[in-house]
UniProtKB/Swiss-Prot annotation:
Coiled coil: none annotated. The keyword Lyase does not apply. Iron-sulfur cluster binds at C44, C108, C110. The gene is erpA. This is Putative iron-sulfur cluster insertion protein ErpA. GO terms for biological process: iron-sulfur cluster assembly. Homodimer.
């Protein structure tokens, strides 16, 4: 059973991130795409974040919806992302999706690796 969560304190999917995902999905021409955010082992701090587009919603995924866009998180990743903010930023260092995670005890300078 899929869980659709509308509770901002569990995870924040910012307007900026949702709008960028919507733009990317429109460029792909496939309205069935959803953004999957995941945590995997690796990176210089033990865990790393990943992003991919997915048409499939797994039975145990948690789905967050914002501005017509769906963000998917698998159960293993969800435990590391509770309370996190998924954002999109554009700056001098380039454009990127950013995760601000209160569960991370340390992060790497690369911004995509953390320890918990």
């Amino acid at each position: 059973m899929n869980t659709v969560v509308d509770t901002p304190e569990l995870m924040v999917f910012t307007d900026s991130a949702a709008m960028k995902v919507k733009e990317l999905i429109e460029e792909e021409g496939n309205p069935e795409l959803k953004l999957r955010v995941f945590v995997s082992g690796g990176g210089c701090s033990g865990f790393q974040y990943g992003f991919t587009f997915d048409e499939e919603v797994n039975e145990d995924d948690t789905a967050f919806e914002k501005n017509g866009v769906t963000l998917l998180v698998d159960p293993m990743s969800y435990q590391y992302l509770v309370g996190a903010e998924i954002d999109y930023s554009e700056g001098l260092e380039g454009s990127q999706f950013v995760i601000r995670n209160p569960n991370a005890t340390s992060t790497c300078g690369c911004g995509s690796s953390f320890s918990a």
